[in-house]
Curated annotation (Swiss-Prot):
The keyword Hydrolase does not apply. This is Type II pantothenate kinase. It comes from Staphylococcus saprophyticus subsp. saprophyticus (strain ATCC 15305 / DSM 20229 / NCIMB 8711 / NCTC 7292 / S-41). Pathway: Cofactor biosynthesis; coenzyme A biosynthesis; CoA from (R)-pantothenate: step 1/5. Its EC number is 2.7.1.33. Catalyzes the phosphorylation of pantothenate (Pan), the first step in CoA biosynthesis. Gene3D superfamilies: 3.30.420.40.
């Protein structure tokens, strides 16, 4: 059995391959000691590590494992998943939305990091908690799905009420810019969280499209744990990507690209 571990800032992603079969699992980073204990029961020759805490894990193993740069591991794993899911792309941007967000260009032979932003899952959870008091990720994302952004976010259609706007009316003119126009209304937790997720999605997409244009590609693959149980984020990112003239790809098990890639490098 081969084991790939991507130890990130919030989650530890684990891929196990044996006899042509693959399993995926996650643990919280706070459970890292338990993961280390489990790894120490395995054959070190079969352990492959990547991510920000890979070096720390490696130091506590009984013997030396293989450690890879997380960007290279994610690129390799994504390449495998894209082909397995029938997407044969010559070049593409891949946007990895974890606690923060990292952007990369790949031409199928090599990857290079082309940008990064602090907007990501960490902002959804942190700002979401400050606004609502909800700390559980699933409860937070479940709640957000039913939110009404129109009373919080100012859209182009709100400005051009009686005339045709020069750009799509569905574009956001100002995130949270409609709040002071609706002080007579109650803002629910769902409304607040939907708007938080929307601003994260719009920033991620804007950055992705910008670097895609810089590298003459229209393909953008979105991966990362922040899309888990978060259809609203997926929809915002997909709609904005299409609106900007690019092709979005969501990859099943994309959050495990780093762990998978570490096995195959």
């Amino acid at each position: 059995m081969k084991i790939g571990v991507d130890a990130g800032g919030t989650l530890i992603k684990i891929v196990q391959e044996k006899n042509g079969e693959r399993t995926y699992s996650t643990r919280l980073t706070t459970e890292i000691e338990e993961v280390i204990q489990w790894l120490n029961q395995q054959d070190c020759n079969n352990i492959n590590l990547t991510g920000g805490q890979a070096a720390m894990i490696n130091e506590q193993l009984n013997c030396e494992s293989r450690v890879f740069v997380e960007f290279d591991a994610a690129a390799k794993g994504l390449e495998i998943l894209l082909e397995e899911q029938g997407h044969f792309l010559d070049d593409y941007i891949f946007t990895n939305v974890g606690t923060g967000t990292s952007l990369h260009f790949s031409n199928g032979k090599a990857q290079k990091r082309v940008g990064g932003i602090g907007t990501g899952g960490g902002m959804i959870q942190g700002l979401g908690y400050l606004l609502t008091g909800i700390s559980n990720y699933k409860q937070l994302t479940d709640t957000a799905q039913n939110g009404n952004r129109d009373i919080i976010d100012l859209k182009v259609k709100h400005i051009y009420k009686d005339s045709e706007p020069p750009i799509s009316g569905d574009l956001t003119a100002a995130n949270f810019g409609n709040v002071l126009h609706h002080l007579d209304e109650s803002f629910t937790d769902a409304d607040k969280l939907a708007s938080v997720i929307a601003v994260v999605g719009e920033v991620i997409t804007t950055m992705s499209i910008t670097v895609a244009r810089e590298h003459n590609t229209k393909n953008v693959a979105y991966i990362g744990s922040s899309f888990h149980n978060n259809d609203l984020l997926k929809d915002v990112v997909k709609d904005y990507t299409v609106l900007r003239g690019c092709e979005p790809y969501y990859i099943e098990h994309g959050a495990f690209s780093g762990a998978l890639g570490s096995i195959h490098l």
